[in-house]
Swiss-Prot record:
Residues 1-20 form the signal peptide. It is found in: Secreted. Induction: Expression is down-regulated in presence of human keratinocytes. Glycans are attached at N333. Pfam families: Glyco_hydro_20, Glycohydro_20b2. It comes from Arthroderma benhamiae (strain ATCC MYA-4681 / CBS 112371). Its main location: secreted. It is an enzyme of class 3 (hydrolase). This is Probable beta-hexosaminidase ARB_01353. It catalyses: Hydrolysis of terminal non-reducing N-acetyl-D-hexosamine residues in N-acetyl-beta-D-hexosaminides. Belongs to the glycosyl hydrolase 20 family.
Length: 616
């Protein structure tokens, strides 16, 4: 079920309900331009005729002290006091330009100032179930009220996790007046909301390049501010094995260095850091594909095609889609013993109820290098690699589940790949889709599978940076060979298979459930935006994720449409620009989205002046 259905918030002024026309929505934004948190509520109560609410020199806390709620408030309040934040990108009226011969525009009213309300002296927090565990579909809803005559900020939530979201909203709404040197909230208001989807996350890949624990925590801080709640941690890959495994300590010989290893203590520290911010960590040990480093240290026979030339200088003979090659030999009995032992240790480290088993991009040519697979095919002349993979699925899922019960996730390839696929995947396995966009989402949900959306054409954050494999003659071209027609170096992808670069608008405008029936929509658990790390490490991971991941955050929390079903892209522009500034003020190195001129001149950098240009 679509989680909480965004709680069906209604927007009203004291004088009545706001019409949901674009002009009315813009007018509403102008009445309190500093109240523009991300994710943006679809609609909310605004007391537009009331004045500012100043904060007392000290705001006291009145609420639960357990489950980390008090600690979350202290982080919120200390951030407010330290940053002395004032929004850097405010919403403005529809610009008036010198008209083209038949163009005209009408001026917009400015909001009227009103006398300030009662000073805010305390925050009062009520949580119905303070012991609620952080888990899939936990209630994350909250209400946040600042009334004109009250001296308290009122927060109500079902669980500690909703209260945390209220704090991150409040952080973005309290601003600082340099002239009076006082903190204030521009207008009394009430926000009451919850997420559309229970899984809202990003994928961090530490297998291609190592990502330090401090940088992982930086991503968690940004996630918490934007209400993302799942870190999909793709820990290992063929290129390296950075995870400490006590059962097989030799695996970390394939880490890039002894310093580039996640110890058990570090893993637990990251998980706890995430939990304190309302974020679950879902581990992925990608198997049976993308498996060479680490595995081969246990037994070289565990890995097929590990010593092959990945492209064979002739792509029809490739053994991997990128260097270095290697897949678990699924016809070798010892593979299953090692998998079970490894899962037992990893599942004891990661407490989440979901566990990702990988399963993407299996290459048939790789198994031509396996004596065990060759023998199996000879002994089963009527069977194919699809049948062998089915045997792998039927053998591993029950065995792993018996060790420690989890809900397993596979990449969709395990069922839909044209290369190698199983014929049957249990319906209780979640499938994460990255190919085929709307078509694959429809195909999976119509067949009864719960789905996590990671469509590469919309959500892949590493795309559009050209190729990274070296000694590539395709770049050695001095003149355009096909003028007027895009090709590799001239208007083409330049070696990035998933080009172009995914802008925040591309992410935000993705209506991934638009072609689904009601029952099919119930199978969408949410979305995760991957950032594969072939060209990513500590130096650039944060600006690659942020602020684009914030567009995903709003899409999955409150949606990209207003309550009348119209796209909110026009008003999202100032909101995400401002959120980027808020991230950088917090020491999170998010990339700029536009020249600063655009922040200072709202909508002067739009492609079209019509606020309804983005249709849906």
């Amino acid at each position: 079920m679509r989680f909480a259905k965004a709680l069906a918030i209604t927007a009203v002024l004291l004088s009545g309900v706001v019409e949901a026309t674009s002009d009315a929505v813009i007018e509403e934004a102008l009445k309190a331009p500093t109240i523009n948190p991300l994710p943006g509520p679809v609609t909310w109560y605004l007391h537009a005729d009331e004045g500012r609410k100043y904060l007392a020199p000290f705001v006291s806390y009145h609420g639960p002290h357990k489950s980390g709620i008090r600690d979350a408030w202290e982080r919120c309040y200390s951030t407010i006091r330290r940053l002395k934040w004032y929004p850097q990108a405010l919403e403005g009226p529809i610009p008036k330009f010198d008209p083209f011969p038949d163009q005209s525009s009408k001026p917009k009213e400015k909001r009227q100032n009103a006398p300030p309300g009662a000073m805010i002296r305390r925050v009062r927090v009520k949580v119905k179930d303070v012991d609620a565990k952080l888990a899939h579909k936990v209630d994350e809803s909250y209400s946040l009220t600042v009334s004109a005559k009250s001296e308290a900020i009122e927060i109500e939530a079902q669980t500690p996790w909703g209260a945390r979201h209220a704090f991150t909203t409040l952080q973005q709404i309290v601003v600082y007046d340099e002239k009076s040197q006082r903190f204030y909230i521009e207008r009394p208001f009430t926000i009451s909301e919850g997420p559309l989807y229970p899984i809202r996350g990003i994928l961090l890949d530490s297998g291609r390049n190592f990502i330090s624990p401090s940088k992982i925590k930086e991503q968690l801080d940004a996630m918490a501010l934007s209400k993302l709640n799942v870190l999909h941690w793709h820990i290992t890959d063929t290129q390296s094995w950075p995870l400490q495994v006590n059962t097989y300590p030799q695996m970390t010989e394939d880490a890039y260095s002894k310093r580039m290893v996640y110890s058990h203590a570090t893993i637990k520290e990251i998980i706890e850091y995430a939990r304190q911010r309302g974020i679950r960590v879902i581990p992925e040990i990608d198997t049976p594909s993308h498996s060479s480093s680490g595995w081969k240290r246990i037994d070289p026979d565990l890995v097929a095609c590990g010593n092959s030339w990945w492209s064979n200088d002739f792509f029809p003979h490739h053994t991997a889609l990128e260097p270095n090659p290697g897949q678990l030999d699924i016809a070798y009995n010892k593979t299953y013993e090692v998998l079970e032992n490894l899962y037992k240790e990893v599942s004891s480290l990661f407490e989440d109820e979901f566990h990702h088993l990988g399963g993407d991009e299996l290459q048939p040519n790789c198994y031509k290098f396996s004596k065990h697979v060759t023998k199996w095919l000879a002994e089963h002349p009527d069977m194919t690699l699809n049948d062998l993979l089915q045997e792998y699925v039927d053998r591993t899922l029950p065995a792993l589940d018996k060790i420690k019960h989890r809900r397993f996730i596979y990449w969709e390839d395990m069922l839909l790949s044209e290369q190698i696929h199983a014929e049957r995947i249990p319906r209780n396995v979640v499938l994460q889709t990255w190919n085929g966009g709307l078509d694959n989402i429809k195909k999976l949900t119509s067949n009864g599978y719960d789905v996590i959306v990671s469509s590469a054409d919309f959500f892949y954050l590493d795309c559009g940076n050209g190729g990274w494999v070296s000694n590539d003659p395709r770049y050695n071209v001095m003149r355009n060979p096909t003028p007027g027609t895009p090709n590799f170096n001239y208007g083409g992808d330049g070696g990035s298979w998933c080009a172009p670069y995914k802008t925040w608008q591309r992410i935000y405008d993705y209506d991934f459930a638009s072609e689904l029936t009601g029952p099919e929509k119930e199978h969408i658990l949410g979305g995760i935006a991957p950032l594969w790390s072939e060209q990513i490490d500590d130096a650039n991971i944060t600006p690659k994720f942020w602020p684009r991941a914030a567009a995903l955050a709003e899409l999955l929390w409150s949606g990209n449409r207003d309550k009348e079903g119209k796209k909110r892209t026009y008003l999202m522009t100032a909101r995400i620009n401002n959120f980027r500034e808020y991230l950088t003020a917090n020491g999170i190195g998010a990339a700029p989205l536009q020249p600063r001129y655009c922040l200072k001149h709202p909508h002067h950098c739009d492609l079209y002046s019509d606020p309804n240009a983005v249709l849906g």
